[in-house]
Amino acid sequence: MAIERTFSMIKPDATRRNLTGAIIAKLEEAGLRVVASKRVWMSRREAEGFYAVHKDRPFFGELVEFMSSGPTVVQVLEGENAIAKNREVMGATNPANADEGTIRKTFALSIGENSVHGSDAPETAAEEIAYWFSGTEIVG
């Protein structure tokens, strides 16, 4: 098994409801370790940059508006197969399709306000981590 790092974000719908600790607890219970974390309130420009891959999708404007509507917690997680493990713990994007006990099934309000974001591949993990963190901010 490979020790790897992944990017994780707790979205504004969850921070507004004070769910940060409960979400981090679920991640840690799954064997993931937080090696970098900070609370940020994204500007529209930061949200547009972070989600640039979706710029041509019909939901892009709504996504940018939501992500810049309140604080988020951006994190780097580390553990065995961290990318797959984080995605498993998060659950399906649509909370209606998420397995019981997952973060999204437990906490998400809707497909748009689904509480968390996580990288889907090693390449996106590296890009997303670099978007928010310098190397000196990641402390294993």
From Swiss-Prot:
Pfam families: NDK. Its EC number is 2.7.4.6. It comes from Brucella canis (strain ATCC 23365 / NCTC 10854 / RM-666). GO terms for cellular component: cytoplasm. It catalyses: a 2'-deoxyribonucleoside 5'-diphosphate + ATP = a 2'-deoxyribonucleoside 5'-triphosphate + ADP; a ribonucleoside 5'-diphosphate + ATP = a ribonucleoside 5'-triphosphate + ADP. SMART domains: NDK. It is an enzyme of class 2 (transferase). ATP binds at K11, F59, R87, T93, R104, N114. PROSITE patterns: NDPK, NDPK_LIKE. Major role in the synthesis of nucleoside triphosphates other than ATP. The ATP gamma phosphate is transferred to the NDP beta phosphate via a ping-pong mechanism, using a phosphorylated active-site intermediate. NCBIfam families: PRK00668.1. It comes from the Bacteria. It is found in: Cytoplasm. Homotetramer. CDD domains: NDPk_I (cd04413). Belongs to the NDK family. The active site is at H117 (pros-phosphohistidine intermediate). One of its GO terms (molecular function) is ATP binding. This is Nucleoside diphosphate kinase. Its cofactor is Mg(2+).
